[in-house]
Amino acid sequence: MSEAEARPTNFIRQIIDEDLASGKHDHIQTRFPPEPNGYLHIGHAKSICLNFGIARDYQGQCNLRFDDTNPVKEDIEYVESIKRDVEWLGFSWSGDVRYSSDYFDQLHAYAVELIGKGLAYVDELTPEQIREYRGTLTAPGKNSPYRDRTVQENLALFEKMRNGGFAEGTACLRAKIDMASSFIVMRDPVLYRIKFADHHQTGNKWCIYPMYDFTHCISDALEGITHSLCTLEFQDNRRLYDWVLDNITIPCHPRQYEFSRLNLEYAIMSKRKLNQLVVENVVEGWDDPRMPTISGLRRRGYSASSIREFCVRIGVTKQDNNVEMAALESCIRDDLNENAPRAMAVLDPVKVVIENLPAGHEEFVAMPNHPNKPEMGSRQVAFSREVYIDRADFREEANKQYKRLVLGKEVRLRNAYVIKADRIEKDEQGTITTIYCSYDAETLSKDPADGRKVKGVIHWVSAAHAVPAEFRLYDRLFSVANPGAAEDFLSTINPDSLKITQGFVEASLAQAEAEKAYQFEREGYFCADRVYSSAEHLVFNRTVGLRDTWVG
């Protein structure tokens, strides 16, 4: 990681600087606590870069802890994908991977402690009644008829819950706080609920599972977290975070700090809605290159460094704001413009026959792998009597603004010769099948000797050496900036989010490595797809175009 990435400034880092300077802490301990119920997305990348980046920069530690308290929605598949994503982004967690389920015994003991202090009770209201009794933002809640059970009753009933004596939804453990609180989160929140489901870590040992708000703060405390960082929607939950830790016997009391979540335009960040896209086959899977998941972005061709740079550029604040997709695309363009080797590919080919070259002619022309980086070397590219050019690079007639090949006029083939279009051949439908040209043999990488000006330059591949390839032209998955605001977000799907074409690439790409980025000259940035591409059938994903086509 570069120094530019390493030390962004934000209000959280200022707090940490003050805590270290005052002696409040002598080391920094953070954590990244995802729930393993889906794949990580670009919003999680912001949290990863923040938590792991702080630990790195302050010579501290960052734990990877899975918040695995809901066995119904969680799966080991998501655990493994999250670990891969964190490592791919360039970060390492401290020690072993941790799970909230590691602390189920301690959590249960702390629940018993709260019951013993008269601060928790077993409630037998139905979930619907609990919602009804909770009240609203403008009306206070009302006490459950089970709220004033004795400590002995609650201990016995909680043990009954633990032993499977209640059906799901018929009993829960609630904190005894204040049903008239102006903060709904403090109106006797549920601490434990019943779920008869096998857990991916603990099997069937438990049939009661702690809620997030109870688990999160205690797990932080048990791990000695100094700064518990979460997004703004948990701001009110900080009161419950502190209440739990203030009322149990635990030596450490971390502090929670909130920052704005990432809202990326033309994308969905809700795991539920992302899952719907997968389940309803709107996309191929969680790693579909149109998805905002880290695995999807990686498959599309985004680099880890470009995602880290994006997180630096958007910063960490307390104000929610929408980030333009162009900001993310700018990061990968900047990265690949600097680092991606160049190559030639023709996505919509039409054949050019150079008639004043002999049949079987073959020569090799030198091409730089990067125009501004001679240290990246060069390659020899075959040139022959027949080449492919892109269909959009030829017109029978054109105005002066068109700087490509026109019937009766000249253009330069990139790093090769000047050619002139003499005649064309069409099929029965009127589609051009062949363009017959002549070439100027004295113009290999130099201007014509007679001083005539040839302004246009187009890319090409030798027909005799070209390798067939499929090109997947990905675009934004949604056609509106805020699809989540639509009544039916699926109605805002961009019908042109994927176009597939068949064409050719130069021979040097025959063994293209999966996810290795290239700039296909004049076309955009591409990488070989890690799922579909093979030596027998090359498939390239367009990561991003050379410029933003959504401007205006």
UniProtKB/Swiss-Prot annotation:
One of its GO terms (molecular function) is glutamine-tRNA ligase activity. A motif ('HIGH' region) lies at residues 34-44. One of its GO terms (cellular component) is cytosol. The keyword Ribonucleoprotein does not apply. The keyword Ligase applies. ATP binds at residues 35-37, 41-47, 231, 261-262, 269-271. It catalyses: tRNA(Gln) + L-glutamine + ATP = L-glutaminyl-tRNA(Gln) + AMP + diphosphate. GO terms for biological process: glutaminyl-tRNA aminoacylation; glutamyl-tRNA aminoacylation. A motif ('KMSKS' region) lies at residues 268-272. Its EC number is 6.1.1.18. InterPro entries: aa-tRNA-synth_I_CS (IPR001412), Gln-tRNA-synth (IPR004514), Gln/Glu-tRNA_Ligase (IPR050132), Gln_tRNA_ligase_bac (IPR022861), Glu/Gln-tRNA-synth (IPR000924), Glu/Gln-tRNA-synth_Ib_cat-dom (IPR020058), Glu/Gln-tRNA-synth_Ib_codon-bd (IPR020059), Glu_tRNA_lig_a-bdl (IPR020061). Belongs to the class-I aminoacyl-tRNA synthetase family. NCBIfam families: glnS, PRK14703.1. PANTHER family: GLUTAMATE--TRNA LIGASE, GLUTAMINE-TRNA LIGASE. This is Glutamine--tRNA ligase.
